């Protein structure tokens, strides 16, 4: 199956950007797809019959990124809006809900999200010289709480490196 940008309501001046996968508890597969105006949820269980389930509007932006934890998706953009929290609990029934936006004392611009699904921490980077921001999504996934910040300099990307040995030079269970 082939979906075009106009299928997502994106005009010729718009774009598609990042994507991420989600598998529902029933085993159905979904693509979370960023467009210049929204985060789309597309069922791809049968790739020959992909269908748009929902679109969550966001600020117009060249870049949008998304990640998941439990049955929640988190979406950000370089256009602002903080972290959009999207509930996918009923996605198989075609119900996708924007729970809210997480705003803190930073601008809402973000380039990249990384989620460590083992520790339950979300890392937000690449936004207007705001450094790297850390959020707890384990305690209350619907309302991530900022628990840390590293630097006020620009950080473009992040990755999670879990440590599995006590002989590590680091005194933390993970690094970014």
Give residue spans per PLM region:
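Feature marking well-ordered beta-strand scaffolds used for ligand recognition
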Residues: 1-176
């Amino acid at each position: 199956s082939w979906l075009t940008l106009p299928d997502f309501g994106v005009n010729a001046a718009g774009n598609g950007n990042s994507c991420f996968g989600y598998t529902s508890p029933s085993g159905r597969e979904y693509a979370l797809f960023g467009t210049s105006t929204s985060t789309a949820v597309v069922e791809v269980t049968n790739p020959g019959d992909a269908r748009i389930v929902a679109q969550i509007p966001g600020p117009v932006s060249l870049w949008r990124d998304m990640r998941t934890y439990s049955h929640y998706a988190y979406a950000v953009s370089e256009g602002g809006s903080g972290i959009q929290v999207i509930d996918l609990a009923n996605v198989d029934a075609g119900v996708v809900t924007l729970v809210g936006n997480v705003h803190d004392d930073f601008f809402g611009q973000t380039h990249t999200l990384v989620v460590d699904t083992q520790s339950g921490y979300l890392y937000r980077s690449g936004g207007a010289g705001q450094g790297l921001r850390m959020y707890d999504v384990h305690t209350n996934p619907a309302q991530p709480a900022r628990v840390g910040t590293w630097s006020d300099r620009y950080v473009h990307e992040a990755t999670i490196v879990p440590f599995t040995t006590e002989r590590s030079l680091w005194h933390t269970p993970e690094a970014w």
